[in-house]
Amino acid sequence: MDIKRAKQEIKDAIEAYLVKDECGKYMIPAIHQRPILLMGPPGIGKTQIMEQVARECGIGLVAYTITHHTRQSAVGLPFIQKKQYGGKEYSVTEYTMSEIIASVYDKMEVTGHKEGILFIDEINCVSETLAPTMLQFLQCKTFGNQKVPEGWIIVAAGNPPEYNKSVREFDVVTLDRIKKIDVEENFDVWKEYAYQVSVHPAVISYLDARRENFYRMETTVDGRMFATARGWEDLSRLIQVYERLGKKVDREVVHQYIQHWKIAKDFANYLELYVKYRKDYGIEKILEGTYGEDTLEKLKVAAFDEKLSVVNLLSGRLAGAFKDTYEMDRYVSALYEWLKKYRALIREVEKEGMSEELYASGGIIKTIYFRAKKEFEDQKKAEKLDRDGERCMAKVVDTLEGYWNYAKEEHLAGNEAFEQIRELFADETEKREEMIDHTMEMLEHAFEFLEKAFGESQEMVVFVTELNTNYYSIWFLKENDCGLYYKYNKGLLFDERHQEILKQMDEAEESMERGIR
C-alpha cells in the first residue's frame, strides 16, 4: 500500500488500541496490542508519518534508530544483586533501566502524555548481539527486564533485503505476533504531501513529467545508484535557499542529493530551462495581467514541453500565493479567537468588579497575552504543533504583545482599550481581504492568459488538475468563488465521466462477445 494509506492504518490501529471500557481498562489488552511493523524502501516518509500520527492523535512520540545503539544502551548495564533463595544467599545479575525505556518515561514527564508511540527504525538491520533483544522486544514488549509502559504502542520500521545488505529476516514466530504493513512508493500521494510542505515547483513539475525518476534504486558495476523521496524534498529546500542567496544549482549540486547521475543531469537541465522560461515569459507579469501580445504569440508556437513548463510555472507561483493566503487566514482566525477571550474577560471583570491590577493601563490585554504565551509554550512542549502551526501561534503571541504595549503606552484600559485594539485588528482583517483579492486576481489572470493561448486544450486540463491536487488551492477555491475555475473544472469532470462511460461500454461489449463465443 502507499504511505498515505499506511498512515491511516497506523492511526486507526492506535485509536483502537487506546480505547478504554467503562472501567478504564484498554478494550484490547496490552498483550494483544500487536506491534506494527512498517516494511518499505528507504526515504519514502516512514518516520515523517509517525510524527504526523502522534500529533493528530494527541499522543507522545519517542523515536529511535536502533542501529545507532549497542546492546548495553538498549537493554541496560548489568550489576550484581544479592538475593535469598531457599534460605541461601546468591549473587544475581540485574540490569539498569534501558535508555530507550527511560526516554519514554522522560517524554511522559516533559510533555504530560501518558500514552504514545515508541518508534524503532531500522529494526531488521541490527547487529548479531542485538538481534535476540529485538525479537524479545517485538514478542514481549520489553527491553531487558523493563516493560514498555502501558498505553505506549510499538511501531517499528525496516527495509526489505534488496535495499540493505545487513537485513535480518524475521522468523514466523515473530511475524505471527506483529501487524505487518508493506509500503510502496507512490508519486501521486507524495505530490499531495509536496504541495502541503511547499516543495519547490520545479521538483514537482519535473517528477510529474518523469515519474519513473521519482524513486529509483539500481545496482551497477560502479555501485548503488538511487533517487528517493527524501532526496527530492531535501534538494527542494536547498534550491529555495540557493535562489534567495542568488546561487546556482547545477548537476554537481543535484547529484549530492539525487545519487543517480543520469537523473541528476536530467533534472539539472530541466531546472536550467525552468529558470529560463520563468524569465523569458515573465510569469509575474502574466499573473498581474500586464503581459504583451508577443508573449502569447511566442507561447502559441512553442513546443509542447515548453508550453507545459509555462503552465507548471504558473501553477507553482500560484501554489505559493495560495499557501500564503491560507497562513494569513489561519493567523487572523487564531488572533480573533484570542480577542473573543479578551472581550469575554472584560465583561467578566466588569461584572465581578475590576481589581486594581486589571484596571491599570493594558491590564486585561496583558492577561490575555500571557495566557496565549503560556498556551503556546505548553503546546510546543507537548509537541502538538507542526512547523506552520508554531509559526502561526508565534505571530499571534507577538501581535498580542504589541497590543498590550500599545495600551500601556496610550494609558488605555477596559472598554476604551478594547475599542482601540479592535481597530488595530480591523487592519489585520483588511490585509487578509487584500491578500485574498490579490490571489484571486492572479488566478483569474492565469486562466485568462491560458484561455487566450490554448483555449480548452490539454494544457488547460493540466492547469485545472494541478488546482484540484494542491491542498491550499482546494481550500482557497472552497472559500472563494472563481467563475473561470468552475467553468473549466466542470468541463474536465464531464470529459472524465465521458471517458469512464466509454470504458464501461467497451468492457460490457467485450463481456458480451466472450459470452457469445
Predicted regions and their residues:
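Extended hydrophobic/Leu-rich segments
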Residues: 6, 97-105, 299, 501, ...
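AAA+ P-loop NTPase catalytic core and its hallmark functional loops
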Residues: 1-212, 217
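Alpha-helical lid/collar subdomain of P-loop NTPases
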Residues: 196-359
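Terminal-proximal interaction/regulatory segments of ATP-powered molecular machines
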Residues: 300-517
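General structural signal for secondary-structure boundaries
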Residues: 2-9, 36, 171, 186-189, ...
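Charged/polar, solvent-exposed surface patches and flexible loops
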Residues: 8, 12, 16, 55, ...
